[in-house]
Every structure is written in C-alpha cells, then in structure tokens.
Curated annotation (Swiss-Prot):
Membrane topology: Multi-pass membrane protein
Subcellular location: Membrane
Stated name of the protein: Uncharacterized membrane protein YNL143C
Signal peptide: none
Segments on the Extracellular face: 80-94
Domain of life assignment: Eukaryota
Chief localisation class: membrane
Keywords from the UniProt entry: Membrane, Transmembrane, Transmembrane helix
Protein species of origin: Saccharomyces cerevisiae (strain ATCC 204508 / S288c) (Baker's yeast)
Misc note: Present with 238 molecules/cell in log phase SD medium.
GO cellular component: membrane
Intervals, Cytoplasmic compartment: 1-58, 116-130
Length: 130
C-alpha cells in the first residue's frame, strides 16, 4: 500500500512539474514577444533578473523533490486576481489540496491579499458565499 502511494505521489509530482515547466515556457514566450518594451537598459538589472529566475526555479525543483518523500502531498494553486495596473493590491486565491490516501482528497480555499512585494498579508474579507 505504501509503495502504491509513493508511486502515485511521484506521478503527481512529475505531472505538476510538467505543468509548471510548460507555464514557465509560455511566460518566456510572452516576455520575448514584448522584450523590446520591457528590457531594462542597464545590463546589471538584466543579470539580477536572471539570477532571481534561476533561484526561483531551483526553489521549485527542491520543493518538488521534497514532496516525493512525504506521505501526503500538499498542492498550492494560485489564481491571479487584479492586474498590476490597477491601484488595488494583487489578490490571489490560494487552494491547498492534500492527498492523504489514494482516493481521498481534502481541499481548503483561502483568499489572500498580496502586496506589491508579494508577501502574504492577511486573509481577504469576502462579501458573501460563492
């Protein structure tokens, strides 16, 4: 039973990594299509952005390798809210899905307001039930 759970967990982690890498590739295509508008004039700024992107990718890879050893798998799904052009802070919906046993999935839905430095501040207040 544990071996089946471990194999199932690895398949889910591999699938998640595939989705994340596809999203990263799509973002790279979008950035390269608008590169003339968004390219920083200073080369040091460009290298700093590349370093941050590499560090972020390393963090994702280390997190995914960490997930392979867990008996359960937590997943975080971010749903973007406001655009950056609006004056309101960026709002995300954070979905946490935990697989405890094969076939048993528990999910929590929390809304957070993320400020411009992208740190989690506090749960957003909801007007009513969805």
């Amino acid at each position: 039973m544990r071996e089946q759970l471990k194999l199932f967990t690895r398949e889910i982690v591999d699938f998640t990594f595939l989705i994340l890498s596809g999203f990263d590739y799509y973002q790279t295509l979008l950035i390269s299509s608008n590169s003339s508008k968004k390219r920083p004039k200073d080369s040091s700024l460009l290298s700093e952005k590349k370093k941050k992107k590499k560090k972020k990718k390393k963090d994702v890879l280390s997190y995914l390798s960490y997930l392979k050893d867990l008996p359960f798998v937590p997943f975080l799904f971010w749903q973007p809210g406001y655009s950056q052009r609006e004056k309101n802070p960026r709002q995300h919906s954070l979905f946490i899905m935990t697989i405890t046993k094969p076939g048993m999935i528990s999910m929590a839905d929390m809304n957070y307001v993320v400020s411009k430095n992208r740190s989690l501040n506090r749960p957003a207040e909801r007007g009513g039930n969805r």
